[in-house]
Design a protein with these regions (language model features):
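Catalytic cores of nuclease domains that cleave nucleic-acid phosphodiester backbones
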Residues: 1-53
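Short helix/strand-bridging catalytic loops that position acidic/His residues to coordinate divalent metals
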Residues: 49-63
């Protein structure tokens, strides 16, 4: 923390829990920058990479980091809404600070879709599909809680209709 900015505190490795659509989640932020004067909370994640930091946007898609920033921000929001002191604070879009051994130049990347709901389509031709993390969580919870070994909705005891499944394709 900076003595020249007494209204700003940085907190590290804070853990939170929340339930979304009946499914329990938990998270741990690398850092939260809390500005008490302006009533803002800045979630920050530190990423290390063997790739150049200027290529982080590719790793962001490859490793599905959108799930983390969207889910963690939602968990944080659900927690501060219940807190009498923090309920009026605004959560700022996620920041990823990326460092690489290859060039040792840390870069900061902003995630402007931190609070987006539903499915996101990104890329020049909207070819990158990012599911809502809580929707992916529902499917994961289904597998974990039922021991299922096939996709939700697939019938292993009788036939499945090809047209129905093909029509779900995007």
């Amino acid at each position: 923390n900076n003595p020249f900015e007494p209204e700003i505190e940085r907190y590290y490795q804070l853990k939170f829990k929340a339930e979304i659509d009946g499914i329990p989640y938990r998270c741990m932020f690398d850092a939260l920058r809390v500005d008490y004067k302006n009533k803002t909370i800045q979630p920050i994640d530190v990423k290390t990479s063997y790739k150049p930091t200027y290529n982080f946007y590719k790793s962001f898609i490859e490793w599905n980091y959108a799930y983390q920033c969207r889910l963690y921000a939602r968990i944080l929001k659900l927690n501060i809404e219940k807190d009498e002191y923090f309920k009026d604070f605004k959560i700022l879009p996620y920041k990823d600070i990326v460092i690489s051994k290859s060039n040792m130049i840390p870069l900061v990347w902003d995630c402007d879709f931190t609070f987006a709901e539903g499915i996101l389509y990104l890329g020049k031709n909207n070819q990158i599909k990012l599911e809502a993390p809580w929707e992916v969580g529902k499917e994961l919870w289904y597998y974990l809680s039922t021991g299922a070994t096939v996709h939700m909705g697939i019938n292993i005891e009788s036939s499945n209709d090809l047209r129905t499944w093909i029509n779900k394709m995007e």
